[in-house]
Amino acid sequence: LQHETPNPWIEKESWLTKTDRAYTIQFGGFNLQSRMYDIDVLGYNNRTTKLHLFDVETVDESLVGDGIDFDKEDIKKNLTLFLYPDDSDDKGRILRVYQQYFMVSNAARLIIDETLARGGDLHKLNEYAVVQINDTHPSMVIPELIRLLMERGILMDEAIDIVSRTCAYTNHTILAEALEKWPIHFLEKAVPQLMPIIYELNSRVVKKFDDKSVAIIDDERRVHMAHMDIHYGYSINGVAYLHTEILKNSELNNFYKIYPEKFNNKTNGITFRRWLLHCDPELTALFESLIGDGFKKDATELEKLGAFVNDEAVLQKILDVKNAKKAELKDYLAKTQGIELNENSIYDIQIKRLHEYKRQQMNALYVIHKYFEIKAGKKPARPITVIFGAKAAPAYVIAKDIIHLILCLQELISKDPEVSPYLKVVMVENYNVTLAEKLIPAADIHEQISLASKEASGTSNMKFMLNGAVAIGTMDGANVEMHQFVGDDNIYIFGESSEQVIEHYAKADYVSRSYYDNDENIRRAIDFIVSDEMMAVGCRENLERLYNELLNKDWFMTLPDFEEYVATKERIYADYEDRMAWAKKMLVNISKAGFFSSDRTIAQYNEDIWHL
């Protein structure tokens, strides 16, 4: 089972520079003193910038008990102990409100102070600063900035206008956890000074629009943070083409009808200098020998590699680098985690946070399907190693059950002499960026199998693509744009479309049990979760709960896509055996990856939103 422990990632005091900047942050019934610290962040060509962090002077690490358990009610001492604390109860949820306000109040004060220090005019704040609200966690910056401007003598009407020209909102996902709705009594307890402003902002919306669905405060007396961002921000963007279209046409359609000019797309990108130059220097050196070093500054120059897609000498060198990285991963996992890999097997990797919509459970069901095939004598042409890297949110029970299933399969298969020579399951411990830098260059295949319409973008898909892994995926998130760039032959697409999925939800017509009853492969795989073999290595409570979830609910529709997923996996494994054709797919993916550089993303944000 997953067990959480604290990660003191800033334990070296040399990382942090304590500054003289401090603020008194006002909460309902008490104040807290904050202190600003700076971390120098190294950028391209040894340039640096500063990351400003705020801490509470009174934080007390002795509050932490077993794992990450701590006293959630002692706000003065626990406020900055843990990012995203367990929110399975009201104590954890209101702690998030305190944390979010602490962050935005400090940031808002810093913005105002720095504007004034530069001789700026707060009446023209939008000419000096842009606040990009990422998801709804920082949304209280809108009423807080209004409050601070009013404290300095600016009337409410003008303060609202100023802030509405200063703040922009990025929606990163349509999942409920990122579209926060805070009960009014939470806010009245934690940040009562904001409530008159929030009431006024809502009043203006209600007077202007008859549609109750766009109100900031709903009939259940909850404050919809995304609604506030949309009404009082000047830009709303999604993070991949499909995601933005879903926002406009479905999830936020009522707002799009009101403010079509505010909506725009900014497809995510990755720091390709980390995910290619840093973590795969051998591949970088090969590319430099072929096309020069211009791609190190401009990732779109990787397109020049397209000239070599039929050059077998180059293709062999790419395969040689991949094999070397696979051997490196084998050695690294053996030394650090005691995991033994077969470097001649196919490395089929899925690394991302554990969430039902990302459907690690479907990959696990495929492992069960393949286990049965091998038991029946149908052996793969080449051994397969299925590698998972994931962490579940502490309170996300089903996600933890999926991790438990994967760990059980790992143990069961490793001890089976009939199956283990041909199939291996690995769940790497404590998945993080350091591990990703080893896993991604070594991957042959990467899994991007989220339920269509649920993944806003994804970025692991881009990192794998840049390192020459080939994707199996749904038409979701940035997979859609990847498919447009590389074409049908160089990505393996399966599954229902986002339109079909959205229609299922609208009609409430999906019944998981009907797939179980009518498909022998599905029934056999799901039944195996609670089989005697699995119970011998696993925990009955976890396995039975996951079994019942898949059989009776399956909210993220694992089963409708399963048979096509199985068929697509078999096709991708078969295609892997033509090594030159596979190397060509690798090179096409790499040559088309330049678009997904964060340099391009940031330039588009600046051109269309920030105007810096």
Each language-model region and where it sits:
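A conserved ligand/cofactor-binding region detector
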Residues: 1-612
